[in-house]
Amino acid sequence: MSGGREIALLGGSFNPPHVAHLMAAWWALATQGVSEVWLLPAFRHPFGKELAPFEDRLEMCRLAARALRGVHVCGAEAELAGDPLVGKTARTLEHLAAKHPTYRFALVVGADILAETAKWYRWDRVQELARIIVVGRQGHPPVPGAPDLPAISSTEIRARLARGEDVRGLVPDRVLRYVEAQRLYRG
């Protein structure tokens, strides 16, 4: 995993993707010396939560990524659909390292995630395979040199959509149009 360009992976359920995800991607591109950021939607939630269909979340990520040059979408977890370790970051990183042997990888995580790494499958392996880039989250201890992302959550966005409330400004316009056209997250 030496040499080559470094790709920052921004993983998540993206259920739906929102502007704080794009802020994290832009910050990583602008300040962390990475060549690209790949949005990496989870094929299924690592802790079993119900998600919108993967193809819908993948398409919403594609639509969101169009807002920023250098941000792309990686559907690698779908390639691992039959693997018993699908959704485990260590397994996804191993898959990507084998598929792209000339790339180096970084993993963008929120400060809130650092408290949960004990629950992760093979966090030690994740750290071997990727440089960890931590972005701040409001309500968590500050991260030196990193901005605090606004407290926007996909959970709150889904709840607002289910109540018929406006979420403009919280999700990219293209994503909102897709959500409305596909009638996602309606109570």
Curated annotation (Swiss-Prot):
Q: Which CDD domains match?
A: NMNAT
Listed A to Z, the keywords are: ATP-binding, NAD, Nucleotide-binding, Nucleotidyltransferase, Pyridine nucleotide biosynthesis, Transferase
Q: Which Pfam families match?
A: CTP_transf_like
According to its UniProt record, which reaction does this protein catalyse?
A: nicotinate beta-D-ribonucleotide + ATP + H(+) = deamido-NAD(+) + diphosphate
Q: Quote the SUPFAM superfamilies the UniProt record gives.
A: Nucleotidylyl transferase
Tell me the InterPro entries matching this sequence.
Cyt_trans-like, NadD/NMNAT, Rossmann-like_a/b/a_fold
Where do the coiled-coil regions begin and end?
Answer: none
Q: Which GO terms describe its molecular function?
A: ATP binding; nicotinate-nucleotide adenylyltransferase activity
Superkingdom, natural source: Bacteria
Functional pathway: Cofactor biosynthesis; NAD(+) biosynthesis; deamido-NAD(+) from nicotinate D-ribonucleotide: step 1/1
Q: Which EC number applies?
A: 2.7.7.18
Asked whether the UniProt record includes NAD among its keywords, one would answer yes
Q: Which family does it belong to?
A: Belongs to the NadD family.
**Function of the molecule:** Catalyzes the reversible adenylation of nicotinate mononucleotide (NaMN) to nicotinic acid adenine dinucleotide (NaAD).
Name of protein? Probable nicotinate-nucleotide adenylyltransferase
Gene (name only): nadD
